Design a protein with these regions (language model features):
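Sec-dependent N-terminal signal peptides of Gram-negative outer-membrane/periplasmic proteins
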Residues: 55-57, 73-74, 95, 112, ...
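Assembly/oligomerization scaffold segments
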Residues: 1-103, 225, 266-268, 281
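Extended Gly/Ser/Thr-rich low-complexity repeat segments
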Residues: 58-68, 112-120, 239-245
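An acidic/polar, Gly/Ser/Thr-rich interaction patch typically located in mid-to-C-terminal regions
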Residues: 33-57, 61, 189-281
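Short beta-strand-centered interaction patches in the first periplasmic/extracellular domains
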Residues: 97-109, 140-217
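Second-shell loop/turn segments in exported
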Residues: 114-123, 152-156
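Polar, S/T/G-rich
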Residues: 123-131, 135-136, 158-172, 236-237
Length: 281
C-alpha cells in the first residue's frame, strides 16, 4: 500500500461562522497531529501543531469554543480524523518559523453545557429516552446493529446533565455509550457497531508484527487482543470489526482504542490500534 501523497484538510471556526481551511494547494502548511480515541465514555483528545499560520487564522483559533475538523489520508481519500473544540492554544518561535500548538477535546461543548429535561408519564423505552436526549444535546445518535432496549416502567422524569440520562438508559438496557467525532454511539459492551469487516494485512497496510496484550476490565476480568500498527487509515474507527491477517495471528477483533499520528512533511503517517476479542453473546 502506498505511503506517499499525504494529504490533509483542517478547518477551524466557531459553529455557524465562516472560519478558515488549510491543507489544499501545491504548498500546504506544515502540520503534525496526534489523536487518541478509546471505547469509553470519557472524551477523546487530540494535539495539533501548525506552522506559520496567518494572524487572521490565529485570531480565529483564539475565539471561545472554536471547533477544529481534521481530515487526513492519501490523495483524494481523506477520512475524518477528529472533530473537537480548542481547549488550549499557544504560538512560539521555531527557528525562523512560528509553531502553533493546539489541544482539542471531542464534543466538549455538548458534554459540558447540555442540561436536558425529560418527562414521561407511563412506561418509556430506553431507545426513546436516548434519542430524545441526543436531540436536546444536538448530536446525531447511532445504535449498533444488535442493540436491544428495555422499558423503564412507571414513568421517568429528570432535569440535569445529559450524560446522567444516557448512563441510566444504557445501564438499564445493558448497553454502553460514547461520543466520537460528534456522533453518540450506543452498543453492547465489548461488541462492535456494525457487521462490516476491515481486513488488516501486509497488503492493506499492516506494519511490523502484532503484539499480544491483556488488559484488566475492573470487575469484569481480563480482555485479550493485539496491538497493531498500520498505514494511515482513519476509515477504521472505534468499535469496528477488523479481520487481522498476519503470520502470527488470524481472526476477527474489534477496535478498542486507536492512536493516529501524522506529519505531512516527514515522520509518521500511521495508526496504532488495540484490537480485542469480540465477546460472543
Amino acid at each position: 500500500m502506498k505511503n506517499f501523497d499525504r494529504q490533509y484538510r483542517l478547518s477551524a471556526g466557531k459553529a455557524g461562522s465562516t472560519g478558515f481551511e488549510i491543507g489544499g494547494g501545491k504548498r500546504p502548511l506544515h502540520v503534525s497531529f496526534s489523536v487518541e480515541k478509546a471505547d469509553t465514555n470519557s472524551q477523546n483528545t487530540a494535539k495539533v501543531t501548525i506552522w506559520n499560520l496567518s494572524d487572521e487564522h490565529l485570531a480565529e483559533l483564539s475565539k471561545n469554543d472554536c471547533v477544529v475538523v481534521l481530515h487526513a489520508g492519501y490523495g483524494d481519500t481523506r477520512p475524518l480524523i477528529f472533530t473537537g473544540v480548542v481547549t488550549f492554544a499557544t504560538t512560539k518561535a521555531d527557528g525562523a518559523d512560528r509553531a502553533t500548538e493546539i489541544e482539542l477535546v471531542d464534543n466538549r461543548i455538548e458534554v459540558r453545557d447540555t442540561y436536558v429535561s425529560v418527562s414521561y408519564a407511563g412506561a418509556v423505552n430506553c431507545k426513546t429516552l436516548i434519542q430524545d436526549t441526543a436531540d436536546q444535546m444536538g448530536v446525531t445518535v447511532s445504535f449498533s446493529y444488535n442493540a436491544e432496549f428495555k422499558d423503564i416502567p412507571n414513568g421517568y422524569s429528570y432535569v440535569g446533565p445529559a450524560r446522567n440520562v444516557l448512563t441510566k438508559a444504557c445501564e438499564t438496557s445493558g448497553l454502553t455509550w460514547s461520543i466520537n467525532n460528534g456522533v453518540l454511539q450506543v452498543k453492547k459492551p465489548g461488541d462492535t457497531m456494525s457487521r462490516e469487516v476491515y481486513e488488516l494485512s501486509a497488503e492493506t497496510g499492516l506494519l511490523g508484527l502484532p503484539e499480544r496484550v491483556q488488559i484488566s476490565n475492573e470487575d469484569k476480568g481480563y480482555s485479550y487482543g493485539w496491538d497493531v500498527e498500520y498505514l494511515m487509515n482513519a476509515a477504521i474507527g472505534l468499535d469496528d470489526y477488523v479481520y487481522l491477517n498476519s503470520k502470527m495471528v488470524k481472526g476477527d477483533f474489534r477496535v478498542y482504542s486507536v492512536r493516529i499520528e501524522g506529519d505531512n512533511m516527514e515522520g509518521s503517517w500511521s495508526c496504532t490500534a488495540r484490537l480485542l476479542e469480540v465477546k460472543q453473546k
